[in-house]
A protein has these predicted regions:
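A surface/extracellular/periplasmic glyco- and lipid-processing/surface-interacting theme
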Residues: 3-35
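Ser/Thr/Asn(+Pro)-rich, low-complexity disordered segments
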Residues: 22-64, 71-199
Length: 199
């Protein structure tokens, strides 16, 4: 929305952000489908998120994404409810701790965990990395204050260092948002060598 020069289109984009985020807030941090049930992946409610053991990546991912979404909605709408809910999740429900958890601590759920947590942590899912990184824009750029921005920077760099061997262009480009120390040559290599038939 901030890159759109045409006012009607910008207004429409901001309205969509607002409507989606208000829906999630109104539905206790669930994205509810036409049947009245939460979608499979649209679950940011503390009861759901914190039911995952600390080492299960979805606990970190869902915390990071919802804070990014709330910050983005606040940035574009100025509605206090989004800021209030973000701080509530961070301070009353541990979402800041969740999203700051180092990547080296993320792994398989213990044998005592519920079946859903075990399934979520059976293997590393590349699409989860994409969800993290796409959310990092709103997490970092629209941070409510410099203290949070510094923490988010640390979390993003920690994630990048974990993913660095992949030489993924997207990870490097997004990391350049928070640090001058990223692999520009690797990003160029990835973009030049990535098979076009996979697009």
């Amino acid at each position: 929305a901030e890159l759109v020069d045409e006012e009607p289109l910008r207004t429409k984009a901001v309205r969509l952000i607002d409507q989606l985020m208000q829906h999630v807030v109104d539905n206790d941090f669930y994205l509810v489908d036409y049947d009245g049930e939460p979608t499979t992946w649209g679950k940011w409610n503390p009861e759901y998120v914190n039911a995952r053991p600390k080492m299960v990546g979805d606990r970190k991912l869902n915390s990071s994404n919802i804070i990014a979404m709330l910050q983005t909605a606040y940035h574009f709408t100025g509605k206090d409810i989004y800021k209030e809910k973000a701080f509530e999740l961070m301070h009353e429900h541990g979402y800041l701790d969740n999203l700051m958890r180092p990547m080296e601590e993320i792994g398989k759920a213990p044998d005592t965990a519920d079946e859903w947590s075990k399934m979520l942590s059976e293997s590393w899912d590349h699409s989860d990395d994409e969800m993290y990184y796409m959310g990092y824009w709103g997490l970092y750029r629209y941070a409510f204050n410099d203290t949070l921005k510094a923490k988010y920077r640390k979390a993003i760099i920690d994630h990048w260092e974990y993913e660095r061997p992949e030489k993924e262009g997207l990870w490097n480009v997004f990391t350049s948002m928070v640090s001058n120390e990223f692999d520009l040559d690797e990003a160029i290599w990835f973009l030049q060598e990535h098979p076009l038939d996979l697009i």
